Amino acid sequence: MYLPGCAYYVAPSDFASKPSFLSQPSSCQMTFPYSSNLAPHVQPVREVAFRDYGLERAKWPYRGGGGGGAGGGGGGGPGGGGGGSGGYAPYYAAAAAAAAAAAAAEEAAMQRDLLPPAGRRPDVLFKAPEPVCGAPGPPHGPAAAASNFYSAVGRNGILPQGFDQFYEAAPGPPFAGPQPQPAPAPPQPEGAADKGDPKPGAGGGGGSPCAKATPGPEPKGAAEGGGGEGEGPPGEAGAEKSGGTVAPQRSRKKRCPYTKYQIRELEREFFFNVYINKEKRLQLSRMLNLTDRQVKIWFQNRRMKEKKLNRDRLQYFTGNPLF
């Protein structure tokens, strides 16, 4: 006896008191090339194989396939199977329609989750960069949603927006992303800022970039020359006080250091003559493209610097017991 819910075969002798469920013999006998030398309590497979359990029309009235169902009950062969398939056609069509509807609904839900609706602005969902200095920003509308979906990045500027939650949960201020540099302000022309200052000194080479040198052209000489004979021209202090066009945040004029060539020539002349006469001063100013006053002030500061160096050198040698 073959039980569909069991994984093994049971001999009919075990159920002698029960009536046999199979009232008719097997309609499809199969033979196998191997011999069935099985145990006595195991029934051979060919005795229980391919029983026509559900092919009677009386047991399955809803299948009503007409001639197909009758043919299946009589023969059970290929002809009956082919005729019975006509009774399943409505059920197959309904199942196929239901599967197609489910697939369409799933696809629509997936598209709705991925792409934003047409009514909403895509820049709300995707953090579009703000336009800088009136530059044209990205296009708005449903057409930009698809491009923003692949090109939009999160607030870190590198990873997609799905990683923003990690930056929000991280301690410290949130990463603001690469910030665009502000446009540099137009530089104020020096002539407009220094209109109130009179041009120092007299003549000689007005085209020099160092035409408006300060009393301290050298880095150390300016700081060390205070209180001496080279304080600077008296007209500059009055110009700084009365110059209304000078910017308030700038208390002194911009430093204009000398070039290496100018410093080398001035140092060479200072090595031979600590005090320079007017003729030599005019000659240097023409050769170095400087004004007469610039050369004069440089020598004043250089003398103060040499005086301070001599004083420091003397203190070092007298304070050190080894000398």
Curated annotation (Swiss-Prot):
Recorded superkingdom: Eukaryota
Protein name: Homeobox protein Hox-D11
Gene3D superfamilies, sorted: Homeodomain-like
Species name: Mus musculus (Mouse)
Amino acid composition bias (Low complexity), ranges on this chain: 211-222
DNA-binding stretch(es), residue numbering of this chain: 251-310
Family: Belongs to the Abd-B homeobox family.
Compartment(s) of residence: Nucleus
GO BP terms: anterior/posterior pattern specification; branching involved in ureteric bud morphogenesis; cartilage development involved in endochondral bone morphogenesis; cell development; chondrocyte development; chondrocyte differentiation; developmental growth; dorsal/ventral pattern formation
PROSITE patterns cross-referenced by the UniProt entry: HOMEOBOX_1 (PS00027), HOMEOBOX_2 (PS50071)
Biased composition, class Gly residues, residue ranges: 223-235
Known function: Sequence-specific transcription factor which is part of a developmental regulatory system that provides cells with specific positional identities on the anterior-posterior axis.
GO molecular function annotations of the record: DNA binding; DNA-binding transcription factor activity, RNA polymerase II-specific
